[in-house]
């Protein structure tokens, strides 16, 4: 609905469906992905469901108790070789143990995590918690690519992860919310 209101053309699939159980874009490989999946979604699959799902290939199966890492691996599975993804998750996704720790470790070993940005509380209408912006990149190796008719050189960033803690940043907005000023956005970028 949000996309339609804004006049943004998109392909959401042939029907309304549960992304995990009826993937409408099985073969999709995207250059850019932006997502705001439900935070800490409980009971998103039964214990014996989706255990051999190809989206988890090379990773542990995400726990049934919380879909955060199911969402992350769904996004990873959709990235093109040089794709970039940005998505929001609850901060707790940074510290889960067991299976979540193993998946997080494998994301790092696969050199996919470009940046982790912790945002201030009260930035969103739907929750007052601090959330984290994850940035993933499919190719972090040194390379030269043509963009808009110009050659752009990227240095090797495979063994680097940028961490930014912005929990103390922002300014009041509509009395109970926080937003970044234009100056702060320029400084962060």
Predicted regions and their residues:
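S-adenosyl-L-methionine
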Residues: 1-28
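A conserved structural/catalytic subdomain of Rossmann-like adenosyl-cofactor enzymes
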Residues: 21-23, 27-189
């Amino acid at each position: 609905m949000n996309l339609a209101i804004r006049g943004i053309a998109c392909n959401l699939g042939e029907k309304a469906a549960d992304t995990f159980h009826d993937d409408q874009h099985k073969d999709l490989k995207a250059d850019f992905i932006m997502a705001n999946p439900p935070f800490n979604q409980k009971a998103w699959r039964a214990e014996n469901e989706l255990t051999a799902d190809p989206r988890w290939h090379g990773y542990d199966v995400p726990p049934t108790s919380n879909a955060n890492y199911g969402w992350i691996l769904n996004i990873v599975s959709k990235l093109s070789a040089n794709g970039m993804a940005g998505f929001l998750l609850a901060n707790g996704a940074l510290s889960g143990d067991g299976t979540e720790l193993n998946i997080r470790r494998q994301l790092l070993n696969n050199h996919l995590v470009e940046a982790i940005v912790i945002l201030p509380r009260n930035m969103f209408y739907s929750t007052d918690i601090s959330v984290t912006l994850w940035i993933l990149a499919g190719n972090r190796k040194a390379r030269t690519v043509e963009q808009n008719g110009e050659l752009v050189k990227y240095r090797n960033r495979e063994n680097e992860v940028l961490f930014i803690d912005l929990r103390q940043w922002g300014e009041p907005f509509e009395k109970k919310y926080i937003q970044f000023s234009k100056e702060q956005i320029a400084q962060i970028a």
